[in-house]
Amino acid sequence: LDQMERAGAIVGNALVAVKNAAKPGVSLLELNAVAESVIRDAGAIPTFLGYGGFPASICASRNDVVVHGIPTSEEVLEEGDYISIDCGATLNGWVGDSAWSFGIGKDGALQGDELPDDPESSAGGSLRSLDKATQDVLAAGIRAMVPGARLTDVSHALEMATRDAEK
């Protein structure tokens, strides 16, 4: 368990560094380099790099890219973008993997109470709804994780919360 925790901590550190570097004008490939540096400096290897031919250390999905976006130098962050970064690190055979989604710039603050009040703003409306739905689904899954629960119990709670969010 200690090895798993260390791998997860490396991923957490990489995601913090990526979030801190994610500003308007920064390319997704630059964010990839930040994550890879943190991972390698910690003595781990980027899990995604080369897996099934994947060419990067992170998946970077900007705005309407749903999942597993490939970071490029041509794709540059802009004020108000919404980005998801998926990151993995392998340490001594153990894998840490996590994904964070967040907004870019002052109009991109999409974390909890920082969401813009104006639903017509570039970072409001549907992104506000997505952020809330994601938090609600996560909370439902965590509540279902009790001693004796089966994986199907947790997945059922996630499914029901997702269906509620779609209404």
Language-model features and meaning:
Residues 1-167:
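Active-site neighborhoods and metal-handling regions in enzymes and metal-associated proteins
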